[in-house]
C-alpha cells in the first residue's frame, strides 16, 4: 500500500504544475489590477515605454488626427464661415473625447503588460521551486515517461519523431512559430515588431533542426540503430 501511494504521489504534483500557474496568474491579475491601475495613473510612469511603443502611440494619434481632420480639410474654411460657434465647439469636444479615450487605451495596454510580465515572473519562480523541491516526484515522472517510451515499437517512435519534426520545423511550421513567438513577445510587454519576429521565426527552426540531427546521430544511433533506419526510411 505505501508503495502504491508513493507511486501515485506525482499525480497531484503534475496537476499542480498544469493548473497552479494558470490559477495564480488569474488571481494575480484580478487582485492587483486596481492597485497597478492607480499606481500607473498617479505616477504616469514612462519606465516601460520604449522607442517602438512611443512610435506606436504617435501612429495612433496620427490616425486619430487623419480620421477627424482629413475628410474635413477641404471644407474647413466653409465650416468656419457657415457653422455656428456651438457646432465648432462640439467638433473640438469630440476630438478631445477621442484623444482621452486613446490615452486610456494606451494606459490599459501598459497596465496589462505590467500584470502579465509580473505574472510570468511568478510562474517562472513557481516552476523553479517545483523543480528544486520536487526532485522525488520528477524522478518518478521521468521513470513513467521512460517506461512508456520503452514499451512503444520502433515504428511508432519513428512516426512520433517525424510528426513532431514536421510540426516544429516542417514546411508549414513558420506560420505557427510566428503566432507563438508573437504571442510570447506581446505577453512579455514588447511591442510588435515584424523584423524581430521574422528573424526569430527564421532562426528557431534552424536551431531545432540542428539539435535534432545531432541528437539522432549522437544518441539514437547508439541506443536504437533500427529506430534511426526506420526514421530515415519514413523521412524519405
Curated annotation (Swiss-Prot):
Topology of this chain in the membrane: Multi-pass membrane protein
Record GO biological process: potassium ion transport
Entry GO terms, CC: chloroplast inner membrane
Source taxon at top rank: Eukaryota
Single annotated GO MF: proton transmembrane transporter activity
InterPro entries the record matches: CemA (IPR004282)
Signal peptide range in chain numbering: none
Major subcellular location class: plastid
Pfam family membership, one: CemA
Disulfide bonds: none
Record field: catalytic activity: K(+)(in) + H(+)(out) = K(+)(out) + H(+)(in)
Location of this chain's protein in the cell: Plastid, Chloroplast inner membrane
TM region(s), chain numbering: 8-28, 113-133, 161-181, 196-216
Keywords: Antiport, Chloroplast, Hydrogen ion transport, Ion transport, Membrane, Plastid, Plastid inner membrane, Potassium, Potassium transport, Transmembrane, Transmembrane helix, Transport
Family under the similarity heading: Belongs to the CemA family.
Known role: Contributes to K(+)/H(+) antiport activity by supporting proton efflux to control proton extrusion and homeostasis in chloroplasts in a light-dependent manner to modulate photosynthesis. Prevents excessive induction of non-photochemical quenching (NPQ) under continuous-light conditions. Indirectly promotes efficient inorganic carbon uptake into chloroplasts.
This protein's name: Potassium/proton antiporter CemA
Gene symbol of the encoding locus: cemA
Amino acid at each position: 500500500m505505501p508503495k502504491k501511494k508513493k507511486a501515485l504521489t506525482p499525480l497531484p504534483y503534475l496537476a499542480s504544475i498544469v493548473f497552479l500557474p494558470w490559477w495564480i496568474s488569474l488571481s494575480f491579475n484580478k487582485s492587483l489590477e486596481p492597485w497597478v491601475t492607480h499606481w500607473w495613473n498617479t505616477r504616469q510612469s514612462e519606465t516601460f515605454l520604449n522607442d517602438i511603443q512611443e512610435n506606436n502611440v504617435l501612429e495612433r494619434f496620427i490616425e486619430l488626427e487623419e480620421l477627424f481632420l482629413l475628410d474635413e480639410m477641404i471644407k474647413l474654411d466653409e465650416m468656419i464661415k457657415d457653422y455656428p460657434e456651438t457646432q465648432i465647439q462640439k467638433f473640438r469636444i469630440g476630438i478631445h473625447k477621442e484623444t482621452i479615450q486613446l490615452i486610456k487605451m494606451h494606459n490599459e495596454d501598459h497596465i496589462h503588460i505590467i500584470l502579465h510580465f509580473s505574472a510570468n515572473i511568478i510562474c517562472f519562480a513557481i516552476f523553479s521551486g517545483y523543480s528544486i523541491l520536487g526532485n522525488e516526484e520528477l524522478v518518478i515522472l521521468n521513470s513513467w515517461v521512460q517506461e512508456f517510451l520503452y514499451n512503444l515499437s520502433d515504428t511508432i517512435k519513428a512516426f512520433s519523431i517525424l510528426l513532431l519534426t514536421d510540426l516544429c520545423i516542417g514546411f508549414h511550421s513558420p506560420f505557427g512559430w510566428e503566432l507563438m513567438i508573437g504571442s510570447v513577445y506581446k505577453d512579455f510587454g514588447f511591442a510588435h515588431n515584424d523584423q524581430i519576429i521574422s528573424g526569430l521565426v527564421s532562426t528557431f527552426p534552424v536551431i531545432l533542426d540542428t539539435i535534432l540531427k545531432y541528437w539522432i546521430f549522437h544518441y539514437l544511433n547508439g541506443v536504437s540503430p533500427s529506430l534511426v533506419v526506420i526514421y530515415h526510411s519514413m523521412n524519405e
